[in-house]
Amino acid sequence: MAELKLYPVGIQTFEEIITRNLLYVDKTEYVYRMTHSGGKHFFLSRPRRFGKSLLVSTFKSYFQGKKELFKGLAIEKLENEWTEYPVLHFSMAGGKHMEKEQLERYLGRRLAEQEKVWGITSPAVDANDRLISLIQTAYEKTGKQVVVLIDEYDAPLLDVVHSDVNLPVLRNVMRNFYSPLKDCEPMLRFVFLTGITKFSQLSIFSELNNITNISMRNDYAGICGITKEELESQMSADVDALAKKMGKSREQALEALREFYDGYHFAAQSPDIFNPYSLLNAMAAGCLDYYWFSSGTPTYLIEMLKKFQVMPSEIGSCEADQSEFDAPTEGMSSVMPLLYQSGYITIKGYDPETELYTLDIPNKEIRVGLYRSLLPNYIGMNTVKGTTTIAKMSALIRRNDMDGAMQMLQAYLATVPYCNNVDSEGHYQQMMYVIFSILDNYVDVEVRTPSGRVDMVLRTATHLYLFELKLNKDADAAMKQIELKEYPKRFALSGLPIVKVGVNFDVATHNITDWKIEAE
């Protein structure tokens, strides 16, 4: 077996990856396609840690004419000219968690770095005038049009997207900074902006009316991330090495990777796409884990879920028109655009007749990680004991020991503080939904039957559990409702043994008082 290249985990600079001979999944055909399309202004939205910064860096090396870095890559056979252009590269990644004055100083520092390169010693005061001066200076000194690359253009705004007070203030700062991208158009060769969300009222979208948004185009669907074909061809030896470390066959390793990290689609005709950050971390570590979530759960998403009062069971598994999820974040009537653009739900299907998309949670890493982050909303805190309890519950349920799992859950709930608004069955239903989703089983709530709705359905590899939840009553009352409504008949063709579970919660103790389990 050929010696494997090292993995560029956390490295986002194309030149460093190539010069150090690290693994690079070739995306240069997309670079050539975009730069030779006749367009000038482009925008790409993708979730965090999905390869956007590396893509921007690749464009930078390309426009700097560094042909030697592209040896052996697709673009080497496509490009004949390798013209060098002046490049202004800005990253807004460091502009998070800032007030207006802090953000203005941050932009000033980014501009000062470029002004030093181009010998501007007496810069203007306002950020937009300084950017205009930079573009003019680079254009005049080189005699060539200027390339402007802006990575994570929306980073300063994401943490205040839920705030009606702070968002307009910071948005005006960024609008002022980006405004020259229209005024300087004749001096520009290429403008590329990446981010997570689309803020319609920023000047780049409201004024730059000729910008090309490639975020949902079929021909650019695979521009970021690692496709199934790329994994099995360019990383074939890496898959074999991972399988050996995991003690699995190649097909078993591929299936495990698909279950954990695959499932993203960014267009109606998108290839299967893996999360690149998690995939490379798994290859480097030799094991699967929740790498993307461990790198940080955005607080803005949790805040928006609260703002729109979204129940955990309402996330994913829905149909929507493109305008409902590929939409600006300002004035959102639902959290769907943010969930989609942040990578927590993705396209799973498209019906050309109705022009409706099917959206759902992409994979196991996102499903389990998301519900883990939501759990504190239902138990009041996030504890190590909670994680170990859920792991032990999972083992018990795999052995069909639901009674043992319920005992463990009852003991755990007795140790945690309660939250507000716990005087409804809905609260406990959502808590159970979150907990059992973390166990990585199929869970659904309010499942329709001819005679009513089942509170919760849990499907494991070996059994189908029907839960009825009661508040301040008893487990017998819950079991009687299951039998009276004849819920099991609805699932008779499931092919799995059916188990009925009646559970009662007590408002005073905020815990389970009793439960009853019967096989159908």
Specify the residue positions occupied by each region the protein language model found:
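Conserved catalytic cores of phosphodiester-cleaving nucleases, focusing on short active-site segments
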Residues: 432, 456-471, 485
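Metal-dependent nuclease catalytic cores in nucleic-acid-processing enzymes
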Residues: 177-184, 337-345, 433-437, 481-501
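Active-site metal-binding core of divalent-cation-utilizing nuclease and nuclease-like domains
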Residues: 137-142, 433-461
